[in-house]
């Protein structure tokens, strides 16, 4: 029986670094102290696009070229390309079309864009893995996630402006006879917060017709802790139905949105610190690519090795939670 493994992973981020002091000073001028906020979120610095020629698509193209080189492959070797983003550079054509052209993929390569907000790349990898298992003609897939978050971050709201960074991550999935790779995934969706995080703030129609601001995300306050009980339930179910316990997990690549969330999950399951891959102090929050940048850094540092069981967890606005098990 075939399995789907992560053959290679690579990333791209801009060179420009902004540290916390910039944002502390920015909000002090507005009469607000955000130092505690930055501690809770676990921020120190972030990579931010500062060149007009860079955007979410260019980051994705660079990450794609890097992962193909790492895998020893070309665009001709790909059967499937999926671009995950919540900040597409274009809607016509899809961004994956530009990836296809840049790497000169074949005419029979399947391409698509997808958007599950911050849960996007995890959803894309999970669903591509299942599709590859079902389709005998698909042997390799490129999943690239890229968000130009600073483009639409709201300078009046620290939850985006001081919290986000820009980056892209690309993975190559490969069908294999090895006893490794994709294991399972679980979802929980509750639409209770569907009107709390909006871009465009009042919908595309009003933005295009000039009746609403299109410049920034509008983020209204809500209690994100409500997502934790279903998180514990779905992780418990995911582990149980695959005959695993939390002690069988070798590494945790969670959403880097807030360090406080990671610490709560870690405390709930009593996960050893060395198993928690945290990169939010370096990259800040990169949106769709967030758990996979953690995977990349875990592999790079030697904390994640071939054969390790990796638990992914992330959340998309609205909200949708995704947990996924992969044997790297």
For the regions a language model picked out, list residue spans one by one.
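Buried hydrophobic positions in well-ordered alpha/beta secondary-structure cores of metabolic enzymes
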Residues: 6-8, 37, 67, 78-81, ...
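Claisen-condensing/thiolase-fold acyl-transfer catalytic domains that form or cleave C-C bonds
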Residues: 57, 61, 87-88, 101, ...
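Conserved beta-ketoacyl condensing-enzyme motif
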Residues: 6, 52-116, 238-262, 266-268
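Short acidic, glycine/serine/threonine-rich loops at helix termini
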Residues: 18, 92-93, 125, 152-156, ...
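Acidic, glycine-rich active-site loops and adjacent beta-strand->loop/helix elements
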Residues: 12, 84-89, 116-119, 145-151, ...
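Acidic-glycine-rich active-site phosphate/pyrophosphate-binding loop
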Residues: 31-39, 90-105, 143-149, 204, ...
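Condensing-enzyme catalytic core mediating Claisen C-C bond formation in acyl metabolism
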Residues: 1-52, 157-225, 233, 328
């Amino acid at each position: 029986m075939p399995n789907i493994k992560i053959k290679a992973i690579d990333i791209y981020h801009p060179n420009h670094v902004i540290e916390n002091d910039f944002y502390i000073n920015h909000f002090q001028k507005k009469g607000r102290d955000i130092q505690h906020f930055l501690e809770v979120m676990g921020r120190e610095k972030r990579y931010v696009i500062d060149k007009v020629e860079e955007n979410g698509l260019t980051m994705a193209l660079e990450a794609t070229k890097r992962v193909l080189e790492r895998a020893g492959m070309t665009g001709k070797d790909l059967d499937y390309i999926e671009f995950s983003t919540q900040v597409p550079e274009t809607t016509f054509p899809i961004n994956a079309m530009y990836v296809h052209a840049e790497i000169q993929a074949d005419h029979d390569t399947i391409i698509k864009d997808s958007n599950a907000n911050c849960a996007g790349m995890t959803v894309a990898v999970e669903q591509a893995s299942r599709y590859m298992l079902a389709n005998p003609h698909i042997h390799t897939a490129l999943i690239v996630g890229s968000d130009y978050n600073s483009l639409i971050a709201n300078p009046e709201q620290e939850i985006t402006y001081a919290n986000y960074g820009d980056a892209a991550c690309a993975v190559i999935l490969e069908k294999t006879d090895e006893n490794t790779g994709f294991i399972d995934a679980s979802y929980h969706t509750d639409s209770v917060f569907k009107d709390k995080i909006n871009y465009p703030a009042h919908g595309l129609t009003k933005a295009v017709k000039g009746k609403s601001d299109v410049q920034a995300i509008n983020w209204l306050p809500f209690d994100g802790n409500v997502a934790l009980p279903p998180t514990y339930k779905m992780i418990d179910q995911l582990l149980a139905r695959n005959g695993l316990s939390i002690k069988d997990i070798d590494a945790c690549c969670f959403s880097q949105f807030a360090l406080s969330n990671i610490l709560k999950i870690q405390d709930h399951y009593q996960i050893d610190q060395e198993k928690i891959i945290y990169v939010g102090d370096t990259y800040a929050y990169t949106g769709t690519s967030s758990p996979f940048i953690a995977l990349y850094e875990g592999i790079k540092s030697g904390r994640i090795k071939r054969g390790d069981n990796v638990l992914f967890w992330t959340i998309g606005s609205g909200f949708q939670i995704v947990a996924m098990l992969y044997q790297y």
